[in-house]
Amino acid sequence: MAEIQNTENNYSASNIQVLEGLEAVRKRPAMYIGDISEKGLHHLVNETVDNSIDEAMAGYCTDIEVTINEDESITVQDNGRGIPVDMHAKLHKSALEVVMTVLHAGGKFDKGSYKVSGGLHGVGVSCVNALSTRMKSQVFRDGKIYQQEYEKGKPLYPVKVVGETDLRGTRQQFWPDPTVFTTTHYQWDIIARRMRELAFLNAGIRITLRDMRPNEEGKTREEVFHAKDGLKEFVRYVDRHRTHLFDDVIYLKTEKQGIPIEVAVMYNTDYSENIHSYVNNINTIEGGTHLTGFRAALTRTLKAYADNDPAISKQIEKAKIEIAGEDFREGLTAVIAIKVAEPQFEGQTKTKLGNSEVAGAVQQAVGEALSNYLEENPKEAKMICDKVILAATARIAARKARESVQRKNPMTGGGLPGKLADCSNRDPKKCEIFLVEGDSAGGSAKQGRDRYTQAILPLRGKILIVEKVLWHMVFESESVMNIIQSIGVRFGVEGEDDKEANIDKLRYDKIIIMTDADVDGSHIDTLIMTLFYRFMPKVIQEGHLYIANPPLYLCTYKNKVKEYCYTEQQRQAFLDKYAGGVDDGKSIHTQRYKGLGEMNAEQLWETTMDPKTRLLRQVTIENAAEADEIFSMLMGDDVEPRRKFIEEHATYANIDA
């Protein structure tokens, strides 16, 4: 738990610092919450919950309730100390009003109130207030209920007492402004993912999520997220569809140089490295100094153990291999969570930790804990070292395979794959490539495309299930190599990790997966997304991967009105409009597109490829740990969860993603 330097009794208006006013938020909302689409909408929930999490991290809150109300408003209630309501010395108004109406006002900026804070990365609950048509704040404190309501960030009346209570804490309810957001419909899955993550990261806290919007059967929904063992449970959850090398979780929780550090590690029989890192509950997708410290400790400690064990060092000598840092991380799943009082974030998405002091602290903590584990568990230590030797052998084979491939790589003067119909424009920022399922659809796509900016790569045969193969075998798959060569990704560029994908010479700004609008198509989408997620994650992180959205139907009314329908709902809307909701088979004609090959070149261009009219879904990774767990499930041996997931998500391959 974070240290508290103020006691509960003196957390008051004097601890609330004010940094700037609210006017700018409504003018430029995207600057404050990232965007005004679904992502920004859900960010409002995260910002509100962050206040409650700060109270939990400070040791004052054990329960948080998040409710999606029937009218799409959100209620967040906790049992913390309650936002202070006394008068603010400088502004001569209630501290609650200051917190709710001034951007970046809050106890988290006053070092005495919270030593660390997750919400600091965001913009505070006042931003939520500014972007809501209505908001109601209630504080349960000193036996009273204090209340204030707002419209678009402006208070409707001063803070007042509206009743008495035995409760303690804060309740916030807000109604997002439909004139600001492109959608105000909340997705259960997106909120649930973040609440689950927060429960894992804050051991012992109980987060209850309710959805009061009745489903088709008239039922509401509730789920409780609670992880008594925190990160130990988190790493097991992420790894639950993989086969473990051994059942232990290597775990540490300590403090070094004033930095609280918690790490959980498991080894599995797969071949990818999956490390998820967090700073103050924020997912640092781009890594940073804490990840650098972890990797350095892992390499140094395991190498020292192998060197000092005569049997293992003899094994390495016999195999004639030199072990590299990456070999120690193959088949490793880890969650690293640290708390930093003043985090410095860098990188493209501001999700990379820059604090230099953190690397040494994490390296020291992990080094000590891992050394102790290896000494106390020689059997498991031997299993890890055997896997490391196998990884090193495979890496050397991969380098040879890669070098033979890169001799023919477009970036080194060789030819492009013969199947690629390239575009004539040479400016990558203006170019896009379609990865098209099957030759017949590839033919239509080649005819229908804009040859100046659009390239087509038909994919024939099975896409390799990359989750299940040794790293070097990926380079032996023709379909995978065609993709890698075509888009211009290079591996093991001088000075980089052998497995690091370098996208500096990416040949296209958009890489678009175009498959049939059915379950098989969704499965192929998933295989290709897994390839990028596991081997070329930067392509996704930097926003280059998309999924095309071909129509499901062409609906015609009396040969006069034609409409492409991309969902079952759109088809029903067409029937409602022209035929009283029923397909009578006379005035209405419905053509179901079972595959891309059923469309001619003109139709394919019009519906799926024309930048002016097409629907593209960008593949993003909002929550890397959840994506990791989903991808390992989709590529795992258990057929039933995979079939269920793909059938449920066939109309939208949103794995966040």
Regions found by a protein language model. Give the residues of each.
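Conserved short strand/loop->alpha-helix "switch" segment adjacent to the catalytic nucleotide/phosphoryl-transfer site
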Residues: K27-V45
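Helical (often loop-to-helix) elements that flank the catalytic cores of nucleotide-handling enzymes
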Residues: A89, E346-A359, Y564-Q570, F574, ...
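Short adenine-binding "F-helix/F-box" segment of the Bergerat
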Residues: H88-A89, L96
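GHKL-family ATPase ATP-binding module
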Residues: M1-N15, L22, L44-N46, D54-A56, ...
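A short glycine-centered beta->alpha linker in the GHKL/HATPase_c
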Residues: G82-M87
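C-terminal interaction appendages of subunits in large macromolecular complexes
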Residues: T393-T412, D427-E432, G443, Q447-R449, ...
